[in-house]
C-alpha cells in the first residue's frame, strides 16, 4: 500500500514538472540604451560649433534609438461564430433465395428448405449538431516604450514593458511594434491602433491567477474528457 502511494506521489510530481509555460508573445529586448555620442570637435574660435549644434525649429519627436514615447492601448475585439451540421445516412439490403441451395456440412433437407427464403435489412443514422461562440474583449491601458531601432524609411521599432505589483499580485504589460513618426502627437503619444506588427501581452501572476485558472490535474482530465 505504501509503495502504491509513493508511486502515485512521484507520478504527480513528474506530471507537474511537465507543465511548460507558453513562450512570451513579445520577443527580443524591451529597452535600448542610447548610442554613444561622437567625440566633440575642438573649438576653432568660430561662433558655430558642430559639437553643440541643436536645431532651433526641430520638433521634440522620438527619432533616435533610446528615445521614448507613450502608447495608448485601445484594443476592442468582438467575434461571433455559428455552426450547424445535419447528417443523415440510410442503407438497405434485400436478397431472395428462390431455389434450394447446396451448402457443405448442412443436411440436404435443411439446405433444400432454404428455397423461397428472403433476407431484408435496413439501417439509418442521423446526426445533428449546433454550436455558437461569441467573444468580446476590451483592453485599455497605457505604456511608455523605447525606440530600439530606426528603419531605413524612418519608421521606429519600439518595445517596452511595464510591471505593477499590488500586494501579492503582479501585472505585466509588454508591447512591441513599428510606429510611423507622423502618427506621433506633439505630446509623444500614439494609439496602439496605429502600431504596425503590434504584439501586446498582458499577464497577471499571483492569487488571482491561481483562482481563475484550473489546476494542472484538472487540465489533464479536461483534455482527456472534454465533454
UniProtKB/Swiss-Prot annotation:
Write one Gene Ontology MF term. Answer: cytoskeletal motor activity
**Which residues are modified by lipidation (S-diacylglycerol cysteine)?**
18
Topology term for the membrane: Lipid-anchor
> Is this entry keyworded Membrane?
yes
Q: Where in the cell is it found?
A: Cell outer membrane; Bacterial flagellum basal body
User: InterPro entries, per this entry?
Assistant: Flag_Lring
Mention one GO biological process in which this protein takes part, according to its record: bacterial-type flagellum-dependent cell motility
What are the record keywords, sorted?
A: Bacterial flagellum, Cell outer membrane, Lipoprotein, Membrane, Palmitate, Signal
Where a lipid (N-palmitoyl cysteine) is covalently attached, the residues are 18
**Highest taxon of the lineage:** Bacteria
Signal sequence, renumbered to the chain:
1-17
Which Gene Ontology cellular component annotation is one that this UniProt entry carries? cell outer membrane
Q: Which Pfam families match?
A: FlgH
What binding partners and quaternary form does the record give?
A: The basal body constitutes a major portion of the flagellar organelle and consists of four rings (L,P,S, and M) mounted on a central rod.
Q: Quote the HAMAP family the UniProt record gives.
A: FlgH (MF_00415)
This molecule's function is given as:
Assembles around the rod to form the L-ring and probably protects the motor/basal body from shearing forces during rotation.
Return the similarity comment: Belongs to the FlgH family.
Record's protein name? Flagellar L-ring protein 2
